[in-house]
């Protein structure tokens, strides 16, 4: 029995089949241990825990309860084959019934022990499987936890780096703000110091002015007191010779003072005369400038006239080119009617060239229209607000004529009319400046007469009145001079603006003439290329023309239509 139990503990296989010989040779101690299932369980797992012992005791109790009610004479049926083979030869019936009962009891105990071992083995296997599964789950959980720990550590490091960068940025911002605050505080302190310094300087200046005023008032009071005292002295000494002598001395002193004052007034009068001479020189210089401006305006008019002549020459050359193009077109239409029809590719190329020429013509018309609009704007700007009422009818008629025609077509002769009107306006402005110059010359003559009158009357009037009048005249002359300079400056600015506008108009006209010449050159090249292509085709296809003579009627129509398109294009130009 003990060997069987040791075999169960040592191996994980099924329990060996017990035999009757082994059961008979068991010692008494082993037999006593096998008789109780609890003792067998304790023998198998001597170091088991309390829960395992309780579970084994419950299972043995259940097995014992299931085997006790059975007939003691019957053999156990759990493993009939193994028990029948292991029992060996049955004892003779003549043996002692007690021995038989002991043997049967031992067999039952063996069966119970076998079942218990099998159950324990299965339970051990289940527990090993559960242990492996739990170990696997624990390993997976540990790996998952390690991954989460690694991920959390990495995120923590990233966040820590971000927060460190953010903290460094915030620290730099705080440092910059602190520096800015310090600079602002420094500026504020400097401004306060400057303000206090300015207030102190102003207060000191005010105090100095007050002191000067007080000193002047004191001097005036002293002088008045002296005058009063002198008058009292004169009254007191009027009856005596000494008083007459003192009076004579005082009169001599007054005469000396008046002579000094007279010299001063003469000096001031000479300065006033010099200023008058300077004003006269300024007026003469302004007259010279007006003459120069008139001469420049005349030069601009000559340039405008020359530009108009050049424009007429360009138009005449354009008309000659149109006539030449019409002749070439007619000649080409006649040649195309007699020759073979052009190919589809040449027709496409010619149509594309015609479209390009049409686009260039449209661009030229747009540029002419822009130049015409700009000249009209200059005319309206030169008219000014004073002549707005008189120009309403002209503008309305021009607007109606421009509205009836296309927005891109310049009316016939309208550009020349606008240029003539611009010239007329410039001439009217120059003529309007002549009365201003005349008025200035009249004022200068009046100033000269007044100067002569001042020279004549300077000897008769008192010096003080002469000085005051001279000062007033000088102020009036300065005011008039300033007004004249302001008017001349305005006229100069108007003349400069007119010159700049006229130069812009002339430049635009030159650009248009250059574009027209370039367009004429392009037209010459296109016509020459078309003629060369026609001659080359006539030379390269003499035989094909004879073979395709029957299709000449059909081929004439597109060439004639193309010639009509080209002729209409030059007719529009």
Curated annotation (Swiss-Prot):
Entry GO CC: centrosome; cytoplasm
Protein's name in the database: BICD family-like cargo adapter 1
Domain of life, per lineage: Eukaryota
A GO BP entry: vesicle transport along microtubule
Family: Belongs to the BICDR family.
Record region (Disordered): 67-97, 386-412
Keyword Cytoplasm assigned: yes
Functional description taken from the UniProt entry: Acts as an adapter protein linking the dynein motor complex to various cargos and converts dynein from a non-processive to a highly processive motor in the presence of dynactin. Facilitates the interaction between dynein and dynactin and activates dynein processivity (the ability to move along a microtubule for a long distance without falling off the track). Predominantly recruits 2 dyneins, which increases both the force and speed of the microtubule motor. Component of secretory vesicle machinery in developing neurons that acts as a regulator of neurite outgrowth.
